């Protein structure tokens, strides 16, 4: 009887020790990557580049995509924690709701890296992104430099995405003085749920109707919303006549730029972002010191932050940026353009 009781106690202790030491016993660092969605082209690039660098550093990556579902993302993050990840990297669909993910991770002493989008009102450990305020500045400055007066339409991103707010703040820093002088009139100011092209299409159609098609520029906050904007302009035979901004240098957007229906995009080189994020994630797992170059207040704390700088891209420099970097291939970007209109040296 005593032997049986002792054996059961030994088994129970072994089980507890096994559960508690799972992370320590694992040969490689395990990174949990919780992604909002993989529907947009750019996020697949993020995932692949992140995986590549993490594997170079000897880490294993477990990826979950929530398809824009808040409850599912929380559930998936809990599952990653249950699998014993050493660090959690989160691209939140909703920066407020994702705070519960951080709470759960903290209870298990797992550090959390907020990737590209800030998790608000939480004890998140680190934030890595592009300077989204600067993204908005670049968009608005490009349009304002080309059309300093006229009717503008503002199409923001998802209202639940903190990045969308930061982009808008950057846009308004440039545009506000001209609006105050009445050089620019904002005829519509809308937000596109989940950054959907269909939302941008609807809002732009309504704006064109209200303004009797008298619109000079549309400040679209990313390339997917720009796609919806251009579709609405095409319906009114205004594509190429109204300036349209964007962000992400998606293939479809770059094709529109060289075709002349989208004016510019903001190029955020994904590989450097994902590479830096993987390096930070590994450092967090090892409890190593991490270099930051900024801080961002998320409503709860000043979060150590590493910002990368975005670039303004239009038809004049697309070859020296997006294509030269290998982000997109020239033949893909110019696919819809007659070959005799391709850049010199690429027509053969």
Regions found by a protein language model. Give the residues of each.
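Bacterial N-terminal signal peptides that target proteins for export
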Residues: 1-8
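Bacterial N-terminal signal peptides
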Residues: 9-18
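A residue-level marker of the well-folded mature domains of exported/periplasmic proteins
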Residues: 20-348
């Amino acid at each position: 009887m005593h032997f049986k009781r002792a054996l059961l106690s030994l088994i129970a202790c072994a089980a507890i020790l096994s559960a508690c030491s799972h992370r320590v016993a694992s040969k490689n660092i395990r990174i949990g990557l919780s992604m909002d969605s993989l529907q947009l082209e750019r996020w697949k690039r993020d995932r692949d580049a992140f995986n590549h660098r993490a594997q170079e550093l000897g880490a294993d990556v477990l990826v979950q995509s929530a398809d824009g579902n808040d409850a599912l993302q929380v559930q998936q993050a809990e599952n990653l924690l249950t699998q014993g990840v050493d660090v959690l990297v989160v691209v939140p669909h909703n920066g407020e709701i994702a705070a519960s993910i951080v709470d759960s991770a903290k209870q298990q002493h797992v550090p959390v890296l907020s990737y590209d989008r800030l998790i608000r009102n939480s004890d998140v450990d680190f934030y890595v992104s592009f300077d989204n305020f600067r993204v908005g500045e670049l968009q608005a400055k490009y349009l304002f430099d080309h059309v300093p007066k006229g009717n503008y339409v503002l199409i923001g991103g998802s209202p639940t995405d903190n990045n969308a707010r930061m982009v808008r703040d950057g846009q308004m820093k440039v545009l506000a003085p001209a609006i105050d002088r009445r050089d620019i009139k904002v005829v519509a100011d809308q937000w596109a749920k989940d950054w959907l092209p269909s939302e941008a299409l609807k809002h732009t159609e309504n704006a064109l109707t209200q303004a009797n098609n008298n619109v000079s520029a549309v400040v679209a906050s990313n390339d997917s919303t720009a796609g919806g904007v251009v579709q609405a302009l095409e319906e009114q035979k205004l594509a190429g006549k109204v300036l349209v901004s964007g962000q992400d240098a998606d293939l479809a957007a770059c094709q529109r730029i060289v075709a002349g229906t989208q004016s510019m995009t903001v190029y955020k080189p994904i590989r450097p972002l994902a590479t830096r994020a993987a390096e930070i994630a590994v450092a967090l797992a090892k409890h190593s010191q991490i270099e930051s170059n900024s801080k961002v207040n998320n409503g709860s704390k000043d979060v150590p932050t590493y910002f990368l700088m975005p670039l303004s891209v239009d038809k004049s420099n697309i070859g020296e940026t997006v294509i030269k970097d290998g982000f997109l291939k020239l033949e893909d970007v110019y696919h819809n353009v007659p070959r005799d209109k391709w850049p010199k040296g690429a027509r053969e």
